[in-house]
């Protein structure tokens, strides 16, 4: 009852957008493009869902999502850290191509260039209502914020929750100060780590934000957005703050999971997904909505219940081993995606850009290079082999350095030593076959060098306020 009441209080913020166009857009009823809900967690490991084999974390709603849709075994984030991964997702490009190779901080003056065409830009251009609710992390200055990158509305934190605040941030007149903070103290004191602002659109509305409330606040905001835009196609991008450290969970979930504090955060995320799915059903939008759940990269290598698990993969966040970039991914679209199906083909987050644009009827930009490929036929359950697969390779960047390449089952990694693995037989990357297959190593090395050279020759600038 409390959640429903809170949703009603939030709903007025979205109502004007939904109602003012409902009559015009009602002609789409029965033949409109699908709603798209894209949920992305922060630093969630490959194993950290029941449907991916977690021995201790319970995720009944996400497990049901897997049973009702498709589970991906070989889905890759665009990078092994936050900002580059998000840039890849929203532009359909390897992050080096758009010059977002590393994590952005409150002190930085750069962000995703306003001239980049984002997924939200494309969907907005064909009539979608768009909202970003959660962690942005592609630049916190006004020209880089979601409202300048194709989103009608934004609620969330501008970067990671272990950061600080930029004292130059625009403050709302009704900003809520917490922990004894005030405008004067914010300007006179050194920024405090883990104290981050909560923003609505382009203004700070709470500082420091109460991180124990974020998952539930994002969920309420998402539900209100869905309610207000039920009569038109909508794109809900929900990049959750959790389970990035410092971990936080509401009192209801704190201490509940056998997976420790980290498990608490995942189980609260799962409950939030359950509420969103329930609301879709209540609004009679299940058949009209594609729901996607994934993570921005692999988990932190942390103990004491604060880090996730990438097992059976090797590696963690920051690394180009599989555990750093292969992430869980679930998709459901009743009547289109076969229920209870599994996709074991290579798919990457940058493929969502052309795939979702195609579903929405949006034209891809022709004045720039994209790296994503349309994988709609895979979502429909298509079976491909040999040269017919939509994607047969993937490149693993670490910063500006191209460290690895996958081609089919083979993966070449060039870091401190030359490593060659057959992922089909050796998912844990434990048996180095480089000396056994020197010709394969050389062919893949040449392919890596050629791709990297071409990419950097055609890369586009990041945005800068200087």
Descriptions of predicted regions:
Residues 2-3, 7, 25-418, 423-454, ...:
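Formylglycine-dependent sulfatase
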Residues 11-26:
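Bacterial N-terminal signal peptides
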């Amino acid at each position: 009852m409390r959640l429903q009441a809170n949703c009603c209080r939030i709903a007025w913020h979205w109502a004007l957008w939904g109602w003012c166009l409902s009559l015009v857009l009602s002609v789409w009823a029965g033949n409109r493009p699908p709603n798209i809900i894209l949920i992305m967690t922060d630093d969630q490991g490959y194993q950290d869902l029941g449907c991916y084999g977690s021995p201790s974390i319970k995720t009944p709603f996400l497990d049901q999502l897997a049973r009702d849709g498709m589970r991906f075994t070989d889905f890759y984030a665009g990078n092994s850290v936050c900002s580059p991964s998000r840039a890849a997702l929203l532009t359909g490009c390897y992050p080096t191509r758009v010059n977002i190779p590393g994590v952005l901080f409150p002190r930085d003056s750069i962000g995703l260039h306003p001239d980049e065409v984002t997924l939200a830009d494309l969907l907005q251009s064909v009539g979608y209502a768009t909202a970003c609710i959660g962690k942005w992390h592609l630049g916190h200055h006004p020209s880089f914020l979601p409202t300048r990158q194709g989103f009608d509305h934004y609620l969330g934190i501008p970067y990671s929750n272990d950061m600080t605040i930029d004292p130059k941030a625009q403050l709302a007149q009704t900003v809520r100060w917490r922990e004894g903070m005030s405008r004067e103290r914010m300007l006179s004191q050194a920024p405090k780590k883990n104290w981050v602002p909560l923003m609505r659109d382009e203004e700070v509305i709470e500082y420091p934000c109460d991180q124990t409330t974020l998952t539930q606040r994002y969920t309420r905001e998402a539900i209100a957005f869905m309610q207000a835009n039920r009569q038109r196609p909508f794109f809900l991008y929900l990049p959750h703050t959790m389970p990035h450290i410092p971990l936080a969970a509401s009192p209801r979930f704190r201490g509940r999971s056998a997976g420790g504090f980290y498990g608490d955060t995942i189980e609260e995320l799962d409950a939030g997904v359950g509420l969103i799915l329930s609301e879709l059903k209540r609004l009679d939008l299940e058949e009209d909505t594609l729901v996607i759940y994934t993570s921005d990269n692999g988990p932190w290598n942390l103990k004491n219940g604060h880090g996730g698990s990438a097992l059976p993969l090797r590696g963690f966040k920051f690394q180009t081993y599989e555990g750093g970039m292969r992430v869980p991914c679930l998709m459901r679209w009743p009547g289109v995606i076969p229920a209870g199906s599994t996709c074991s083909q290579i798919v990457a987050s940058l493929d969502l850009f052309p795939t979702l644009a195609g579903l929405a009827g949006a034209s891809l930009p022709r004045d720039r290079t994209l790296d994503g490929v349309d994988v709609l036929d895979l979502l429909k359950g298509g079976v491909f082999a040999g040269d017919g697969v939509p994607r047969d390779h993937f490149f693993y960047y670490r910063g500006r350095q191209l460290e690895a390449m996958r081609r089919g089952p083979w993966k070449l990694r060039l870091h401190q030593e030359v490593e060659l693995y057959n992922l089909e037989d050796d998912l844990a990357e434990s048996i180095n076959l480089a000396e056994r297959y020197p010709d394969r190593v050389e062919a893949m090395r040449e392919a890596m060098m050629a791709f990297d050279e071409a990419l950097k020759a055609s890369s586009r600038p990041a945005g800068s306020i200087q």
